Amino acid sequence: MTTTMPATADGWDALLSDGGVVRIRPATAADEDRLLALHEAASDRSIYLRYFSLNRRAGDRYVDKVLHGGEDEIVLVAEQQGVVVGMAGCTRLGRTADGEVAMLVADSHQRRGVGTLLLEHLAAVARRAGMRSFVADTLADNGLMQQVFTDAGFRVERHSDVDVTHVRMSLTPTPQAQDAVDLRERRADVASLRHVLAPRSIVVVGASDRPGSVGGAVLRNIIAGHYRGDLKAVNPNRRWVQRLRAYPSVLSLPEPVDLAVVAVPGPAVEQVIRDCGARGIPAAVILSAGFG
C-alpha cells in the first residue's frame, strides 16, 4: 500500500520522499512524553494551523484524548532514531463510519512525505476497523495539509466556509490512489540511491596508512579521485590517517554522513552497521571479508 519494507511487530519501515527511512507504528501510552515533546518543539505556526489557536494546552489535551480515549481512537506515530517526528490520529464519530482525522509533523521534517505516509497507513488501519471516510477541518491557508490529502490519491471533497475548509476523504481504494502510491515509491527509491551513487559526504571505517590494507586503498583512491564532498576517516588507534583527522568510531563523528564505506574485519561489521544506524547514516558499502 506504500513504500514499505517488511513489517515488524512494532510497525513498518517506509521510505520518505528524500530517501530517508521512517518507522510508522501504532502509538501506545508509553509514547505520551514523546508526543508531548513533539508538540512542545512545534513552532507557533504549526500549533496554530493544527489547533486553530496558539493555545498549547490544546495539544496536551489532544494527546491525552487519543492515548486514553478507548477503542474509538486510532493514532500512529512516525519515528526516526527513537524520536517521534510526526503523529496522525482519527476519532470515530459516534456510530458512523466516519473518522475525524488530524496530524502534526515536526517542523524540521515537513515536506519530506511524513504526513502522506501517516495518512496512508492510518487509512488502512481505519478501513480495517470499519471506517469508510475521513473528515477534517483545516484552515484555508494550511497548504501543506491540503496537499497531504491530495497526494494520498483517494477521492476528496472540499467545502469552504470563510477561513476553514471542510474535507471528506473516501477510504475506498481507487486506481488513482494506487497510482499515487506507485509514483511515490519510484521517487523515494531513486532518492534513496543518491546516498550511494552521489554522496555529499563519506566516512571510511577502517581507514589506514598501512600498505596493502583495504581501508587505506579506499581512502587513497577517494582522495586521488578528487572527491569534492566531505571526507572523514574512522580508526580507533590513530588520530590522523592520510592527513585526515581520524575518529575513534562512527558514533564520535561530529555529524552524520551520507555514506559509510566499511573496511573492517568481518566480526566487527555488525557493530559498525549498528553504530551507523544510531548515528543516522543512511547507506553503507561493506568491503569486509572474514564472514562465516
What are these regions (language model features)?
Residues 174-292:
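Catalytic-core regions of core metabolic enzymes
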Residues 1-195, 199:
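Long, contiguous binding/interaction regions
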